[in-house]
C-alpha cells in the first residue's frame, strides 16, 4: 500500500477561489481580508481592543469600527445613495475623521458585534448588487462631473481599505499579546462565515 507524496489541500472557508469568475475573486479576496482582520482582533477584552502604540492613535477596536463604517458607507451611501444605517447615524460626528476610529467608549462585545453585523449586512448588499447588475452595476455616487463608478471599483476601494488597515492590525496585535501570522489558522471559526 502506498501513501501519497502530498496531502490534498483543502482551502479554509475564507480563501478566494483558485479558479473563479472576476466577481468570485473580488468577493473572495474581500472575505479573506475581513476574516484576517477579525482574526487579528479576535478574543481580546476591552483593554486589548483599546491598546495603542505610542506613535499612533489607532487601536484594534478602532480599526474594527472604522472598517464596519467603511463597509456601510461604500455599500449604502456610495452604491445606493442611501443614508447610513445605525449605529453611524446617531453617533454625532465631530467634523473630523477621528470619530470613525473611536473605540474607547465601547465594550469589546459591542465592537465585535458592530463589525460582524456590518460584514453580514454588506455581504447581502454585495450579493444583491451582483444579482441586480453584476460588477458593472452603476453606483449612485459620482465624481462631480457625472462619472459614476461601478460596483467593481467600490469593491476594489474597499479591498484597499482593508489591506491598509490589516497591516496596522498586525502591529497592534503583536504589541498586545504577541500574536502574529498572515492568515487565521485553519481551525479558527469566523463569526460571520
Segments predicted by a language model, with ranges:
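Extracellular glycan-associated modules
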Residues: 20, 59, 125
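Short, contiguous alpha-helical
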Residues: 2-15, 23-97, 138-193
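Generic alpha-helical secondary structure signal
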Residues: 18, 77-78, 105, 116-119, ...
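Acidic/histidine-rich alpha-helical segments that form the ligand environment
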Residues: 96-137, 150-162
